Swiss-Prot record:
Pfam families listed in its UniProt record: DUF896
Organism per entry: Clostridioides difficile (strain 630)
The UniProt record lists the keyword Cytoplasm: yes
SUPFAM superfamilies according to UniProt: YnzC-like (SSF158221)
Keywords: Cytoplasm
Family note: Belongs to the UPF0291 family.
Protein name per UniProt: UPF0291 protein CD630_10710
Subcellular compartments: Cytoplasm
Amino acid sequence: MFDKKKLDRINELAKKNKEGILSADEIKEREILRKEYLENFRAHFRSRLDSVKVVSPEEYEQYMKNNKN
């Protein structure tokens, strides 16, 4: 999971960027944090997709019959 402090820092840098007051070091930091965030997001998203199972309507119907509560 991505660290909340890093996400807060990304948002802080984004706000400063909108105001047009980012230094060169802050631009580099922003890019590094963004890259790390996107890598984490993509990995998590891929793992979620890997756990998805596509079923036919018949399989779904059978599943629902077997799992009535």
